[in-house]
Amino acid sequence: EIVTGLVGSEMCIRDRAISRNRYWGSCIPVWINVDDPEDMLCIGSVEELENLSGKKITDLHRHYLDDLDIEINGKTYKRTSEVLDCWFESGAMPYGQQHYPFENEDNFFDGFPADFIAEGLDQTRGWFYTLTVLAVALFDSVAFKNCITTGMILAEDGRKMSKSLKNYPDPEELLNSYGGDSLRAYLINSPVVRGEPLKFSEEGVQLVTRNIILPLWNSYSFFSTYANADDISFKDLEKASPVQDRTMMDRWIISSMQSLVKTVNEKMENYYLYEVIPPLMNFVDELTNWYVRSNRKRFWKEKDENDIDKINAFKTLHEVLLEFSKCMAPVLPFI
C-alpha cells in the first residue's frame, strides 16, 4: 500500500528544484558565464576548482566561494548564488559518508545498496525519495534492498502529542516505571511498525510488563532462588541427561523454544517485526503457566546425587531461559 500509494504517487510528480536561496548549505558547484547564462561550468572536485581558479581552496561555504571567480579565455564565471536543498544532501548520504568517488570505492560498493533503512512514514516524500532518485540517476540502481517504515505515534486521544496539551506520559517516568524492554515490545507489537498510526497507551506498556516481563523475571527468580538454595552449580548441570532421555515435559518446552527461535528468525529476516511478539507471549505462557508450575515438585525435592531428575529440571529451565534471552535480544535487550 505504501509502495503503490504514497511512493507511487511521489514518483509521478513534477520535477523538484534542488536549489535553495539560503546562506547556509552546500554550495551548488556551478559557475555561470556573466555574459552568457547558458554557458556554465559544473565543477566535479576541489582539485578541479583549484586548477580552474588558480587558488587554494580552504573553505567550501558561501562566504568564500561566492567571491571566487573563474577566468577562461577572457570569460568570467561566477558561482550561482543558491545552495543545495538539504533533501538532496540526505539522498547523497551513501556517497558522502564514504567520500565516494574520490576514495573508498571498494568499501562503498561493499555496502551499496544498503541492506535496509528505517524511518518514519513522512520520509516517503523525503529521504526515501531522494535516495532512490540519486541512486537511479547515478547507477540505475536502488539505494536500499529493504525498508522499515513506521507510522506516526499519536496521543491516546488520537491527537498529535503536544507539550502544551500534556496529552502523553513523560518518557522518563515511563522508562523508570516499566523499563525499556516493555516499551520496546509494546511499540514493536503495535500498528506503528506496519507504517500505521498508533494511539499511544500507557496501559499497553503495562500489559506487556504484566504478560511478558514479570513472568519471565519470575521464572528466572524461581530458577536462581532454588538453584542457590540447593547449591546447584554449572558442574552439576553438566551431569544432566541428553535431551532425548529427559521427561516429556522437558522435551516439550525445549521443542517449543526451538520453534520460537525458528519463527523469530523467519520473521526478523523478512522484516515482519510486528509478528514477533505474539509467538513470544505464547511461549512465555507455556514456560511460566505450564512448564514451571507443572514441574515445581522436581525443583523442590531434596538434592540427591543419585537423582538425575532434579538436575534435568534445572538444566532444562536454564537452557530455555538462556536461549530465550539470546533469541529475543533484539527486542528485549535489557532483560
Residue map of PLM features:
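Generic structural microfeature
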Residues: 6-7, 67, 124, 153, ...
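Single conserved hydrophobic/aromatic residue that forms the stacking wall/gate
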Residues: 1-8, 13
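Active-site His/acidic residue clusters
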Residues: 36-40
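Helix-rich, typically C-terminal accessory recognition domains appended to large enzymatic cores
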Residues: 10, 14-35, 129, 140-144, ...
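Ser/Thr-centric signal marking residues that sit
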Residues: 4, 86, 316
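Alpha-helical recognition segments enriched in aromatics with Gly/Pro capping
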Residues: 22-24, 32, 43-197
